[in-house]
Amino acid sequence: TDYVDLLLLRAGAGNTSSAWRVLQRLYREGLAAAIGICDHLGEFGTENLAKIAQGSEVKPAVYQTRSRSYLRSFATHGKVTDHDVQVQLLYEPGEELKEPALAQISEKYGKTRSQIILRWLVQHGVCAVVNSASKERLLENIDIFGFELAREDAAQVEKLWRS
């Protein structure tokens, strides 16, 4: 193929405005099917994303961030989707897996704690990206589509990020 599926501008990498103009040109020339912002350190923020989304000919299709910065401020999700930008989250399991409430929900559904988190993300419109070197873990990660979290269980999971 002679194009990339998704080309991301790494936030904090120099002059964002001029770099974004270059990405728009590459998109218009058909060299990138989609363009977006990669904000792994959480330093770009939704305010800057809003400026680009509102002031550009080509809006970002994706806002990619890491789980720690995103999940600690879940309100970001609404701000991003207000601009029709897909959130892509690099999910890295952490301390939340030790939470007793998550263990109870996990047991209720017969799923792992990570599967409960991933299912919650998907139910909230987030494109979750996970990493694994093991076949078993990869299969576990994709086994999240055969169930849906009940509203009260989803609310319990959301509380993990608020604390």
Spans of model-derived segments:
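An active-site-proximal structural segment forming one wall of the substrate-binding cleft
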Residues: T1-Y3
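Beta/alpha (TIM)-barrel catalytic core signal, keyed to glycine-rich beta->alpha loops juxtaposed to Asp/Glu
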Residues: D5, L9-S163
